[in-house]
Amino acid sequence: VFDMYRIGIGPSSSHTVGPMRAGRNFISLLRNKHLFPEVEDIKVRLMGSLAATGIGHATDSAVLLGLMGKSPSVIDVDSIPGWIQDIKEKDRLLLDSCKPIPFHYSTDLTFEPSVLDPYHTNTLIITAFDDKGKELLTRKYYSVGGGFIETEEEAKLKQEPRALPATEEDKKALPYPFSTANELMEQCRKHGLSMEAVIRANEEVIRSREVIDDSLDHIWSVMSMCIDRGLNAKGC
């Protein structure tokens, strides 16, 4: 349920949320590999569809916000214009919101719409360098839809793009596993359960009933807030 109904900024899950998650994931990798203190330069390449429609979908801003450590589910949308303006005017990126590094938007972030990866058209590469220009870490990401991302390494293990779980917890064994609508209906028939009961039982393996109910209430609250925000906003 929380892979299908997830809170994130727009206008696109594949071109905005996914790239932001990629940037945030890259920061986590730098920290996990103890490379973060050495980073003095970051390069971002947007390719294929991410580049072709990147400006309209704010893909460029999304990646930078992810590199700042921002999460698409809790980001303060009113602060985004100021953060991006600060990057462009000061030629500086606040990595993970704590480490300032030089960043020239016009040269350190490139749009390459003609570069098409055979695995998926929504492709980006992020590379980190030290103060001597030595490459510290590079990762190719695919934004495969719905806000899901895959690394190049993960993609090599698959025959075709497939969305990964949003969290490691989602990989736990489920009492009523299914991957298609037909399999879901078969679980219902086999165990004499409603569709709602099957879904609820699977969810409660991952999270408590209280957490599920509170999270669903929060999602509805954000939906309502988005409606109100849209109705009260001015301009195109």
Tell where the protein language model's regions lie, with residue ranges.
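Short, hydrophobic/aliphatic alpha-helical segments
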Residues: 1-8, 43-46
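N-terminal glycine-rich anion-binding loops that anchor highly charged ligand groups
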Residues: 2, 34-38
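Conserved phosphate/anionic-ligand binding catalytic regions in large, soluble enzymes, centered on
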Residues: 5-23, 56
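Hydrophobic alpha-helical scaffolding
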Residues: 12-16, 49-53, 209, 213
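Electropositive phosphate-/nucleotide-binding environments in soluble metabolic enzymes
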Residues: 16-20, 57, 213, 217-221
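Intrinsically disordered, low-complexity, positively charged segments
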Residues: 21-32
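A structural-propensity feature for long, helix-poor, extended segments
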Residues: 37-76, 80-93
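C-terminal regulatory domains involved in ligand/effector binding and gene-expression control
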Residues: 72-236
